[in-house]
Amino acid sequence: MLVLEINKELRRSYALVERNFNLIKRYLGWEVVFMVYTVVNTLTIAFIGLSPDGSGQDKVLYLVVGALLWGFLSVLFHEVAESVQWERWEGTIEYSFMAPMRRLTYLGGVCLFAAAYGAIRTVIVMFAVVSIFDLDLGSANLFAGLFVLLLSSLSFIGVGLMAATLPLMSAEKGSQAAHILEAAILLVSGVYYDVSVLPAWMQKLSLISPATYTLRAAREALLNGASLREIGSELLILLATGVILIPLGLFVFNRAELYAMRTGKLKRSG
C-alpha cells in the first residue's frame, strides 16, 4: 500500500515536470533569447581572464567554473522561487493549491523540473564555452565536480522554497525581493573572485552562504583534481545545510500559504 502511494505521488510530481517543460515549448522563442543571453554573458566573463598575448587560461577556467556553477544554481533558485509568481500570472495558482496532492508532491515536482532544466542549460552553455576556449580539463575530477553540484542543489532548493514565499506575501514586490536575495548571495559567495578580497564583514556573511562552499569545493575538484575525501569538509557542510534548509523551507512555505489563503492573496496579479 505504501509503495502504491509513493508511486502515485511520484507520478504526480512527474506530471508537474512535464507540464513545466510544455510551458517552455509554449514560450520557446523567449527561451532561445534567454539562452543566447546566458551564453554571451558567460563568454564575456571568460574573456576577462585572457591577456592580450592569449595567456591566462587558468584565470579563464576559474571564471568559467564560477559562471557555470552560478548559472545552474541561479536557475535552480529562480525556478523554485518564482514558481508561485509564474502560476499567479498564468491564473493557475489556486487550481494548483486546491489540487488533490500533497504540498510536498507539488514542490517536489517544481524542484525536479528546476534541477533538470538547470542541468540542460548548464550543459548547453558549457559546450558553447568549450567550443570558443581551448580549456584543459585533463586534471579535473569531473565526478567530484558533479557530486558537488548535486549536493549543493539541496541547499539552493531550500533557499528557493523560502524565497518562493515572498510572492505569496506580496504579489507586487515579492518577486523583486527574491532577486535582492539572489544578488546578495552572488555578492558574498565568491562567484567571480575569491572571498578573501571582500571586506571582513562580508567575509563573515560568506560563511552562511551555501554557494561559498559549492564554489570552493567545485573549483578544487575541477581546477586541482581534488578527490571527494579532500573536499569532504565542504561536502559535509553542504549536506548539513541541505538537511536543515529543505524542511525549514517547507515549513516557511506552508505558513506563508496559510497566510495567503487567509488574506486572499492567491488571486491573479498582472
Residue ranges and their predicted role:
Residues M1-G270:
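Hydrophobic transmembrane alpha-helices and immediately adjacent juxtamembrane helices
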